[in-house]
Amino acid sequence: MSKAYQQAGVDINAGYEAVERMTSHVQRTMRKEVLGGLGGFGATFDLSQLNMKAPLLVSGTDGVGTKLKLAIDNDKHDTIGIDAVAMCVNDILTTGAEPLYFLDYIATNKVVPEVIEQIVKGVSDGCEETNTALIGGETAEMGEMYHEGEYDLAGFAVGAVEKDDYIDGSSVEPGQAIIGLESSGIHSNGYSLVRKLIQQSGIKLSEPFNQEQTFLDAFLKPTRLYVKPVLAVKSSIKIYAMTHITGGGFYENIPRALPEGITAKIDVTQFPTPAIFDWLQEQGNISTDEMYNIFNMGIGFTLVVDNNQVESTLEILNGQNIKAYKIGETVKGNEPIQLTGV
């Protein structure tokens, strides 16, 4: 390799090793529509093989926020990639789109092949679960931009939906049911506050949070992927609107999927709140109302369906091994959201 480049702080050989290590993980995500392999200047996906009449492409990009800091500080890198995938594919899923392919971007102080492999393993796990091809990516070594051991991770997802099946919430009417799908925990938002509360509490992350997991396990639990269960519902039931509950909780996300003059009336007694949120609320002395303005509180994704389809929807979701509840209904109104039972 170039001695000049090495003296400038870039280890090309480490980059080559990282690519070799990640290749087997990437290959298990491939779909038949992907043309060519790794190493090209651009990745190619053959849309014609989808046999869609009038496909719309839906794209999304996101990162994992300061949840990364917890992963880095505790040298646990194998699940944070799932979060990157979930944040992107869950977003584009709200339009009814099936995720097709994904690209990742990793920027780091120094390429450590073993760490890069673990990150990409997580990305590949998320892609494999959602039938999304990890079609390309970039790993950038930038020693002067990041402190030792640090990295950032972002993702980019593209999906497709038939034009006639595109979901934008515009046809939502009063009196329809809102179905909430359980979250796996905190997901990937609010971690600046979470990390502050961890530090403030004085706990050791290796301590047990409950009988099943440590505090670290609870805080780093990957964001749930909703692609398979939601597409299973969409295949047989008309969905009028969908929401991925991320930063801003219920207050900021649920109204985004509803037309003017329609609001969501949510009864928070209709679903359980995971214990991790109770712990955060107690540590921060945070009001319940504010908690719903920050976190997902146990519901990571919502669907709006007709009332006569509630039972069928819940049955399909149960068959997909995900707990779901009728958490509310759409009503006339101009306020962003109505929460009862808080």
UniProtKB/Swiss-Prot annotation:
Top-rank lineage group of the source organism: Bacteria
Single GO MF descriptor: phosphoribosylformylglycinamidine cyclo-ligase activity
GO cellular component annotations of the record: cytosol
Cellular location(s): Cytoplasm
Pathway: Purine metabolism; IMP biosynthesis via de novo pathway; 5-amino-1-(5-phospho-D-ribosyl)imidazole from N(2)-formyl-N(1)-(5-phospho-D-ribosyl)glycinamide: step 2/2
SUPFAM superfamilies according to UniProt: PurM C-terminal domain-like (SSF56042), PurM N-terminal domain-like (SSF55326)
Enzyme Commission code: 6.3.3.1
Enzyme class: ligase
Keywords associated with the record: ATP-binding, Cytoplasm, Ligase, Nucleotide-binding, Purine biosynthesis
Catalytic function, reaction form: 2-formamido-N(1)-(5-O-phospho-beta-D-ribosyl)acetamidine + ATP = 5-amino-1-(5-phospho-beta-D-ribosyl)imidazole + ADP + phosphate + H(+)
Pfam families, A to Z: AIRS (PF00586), AIRS_C (PF02769)
Entry-linked CDD domains: PurM
Biological-process GO terms, alphabetical: 'de novo' IMP biosynthetic process; adenine biosynthetic process
Family from the record: Belongs to the AIR synthase family.
UniProt-listed HAMAP family: AIRS
Protein name as catalogued: Phosphoribosylformylglycinamidine cyclo-ligase
Species per Swiss-Prot/TrEMBL record: Staphylococcus saprophyticus subsp. saprophyticus (strain ATCC 15305 / DSM 20229 / NCIMB 8711 / NCTC 7292 / S-41)
Lineage summary: Bacteria, Bacillati, Bacillota, Bacilli, Bacillales
Gene: purM
